[in-house]
Amino acid sequence: MAVDDLVEEITKKLGEETCLSDWLNVDQSMIQGFADVTKDHQWIHVDVDRATKESPFGSTVAHGFLTLSLIPHLGGMVDAMEPAYPGLKLAVNYGLNRVRFPNPVTSGSNVRTRTKLVGVDKINDECFQVVGEVTIEIEGKEKPACVAEMV
């Protein structure tokens, strides 16, 4: 499918919710694995006993960047068999705008993404840019874990 046709098709969905993912459990082993990879072993993330006693959250919490890094998986952006947009051959992460972490994800919480299409622009005859407003929700909580524009 030609870029112009893809852009035209995607533009019809501006303002619409394009993804509501399944829930994913963020357990302590996921948090510990992220801490090990990033070398961020701050006690609020990895010391269960101390976090239970001293943290205002009553438990360990996921790193904000762990939460953020779940967007591609939760948003279905990494499934080669079902691309986010039919006809799309390749998608790359260009960046993020306005990232905020309004609420921490405590260990054992379930999270999911809700994505709304907010922008699409043709760059050239071979590529276009899509902007999605991504909200990472925490099951049972009103305030989200993360809000970001993904480009």
Segments and roles (model prediction):
Residues 1-15, 101-151:
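HotDog/MaoC-like acyl-thioester-processing domains
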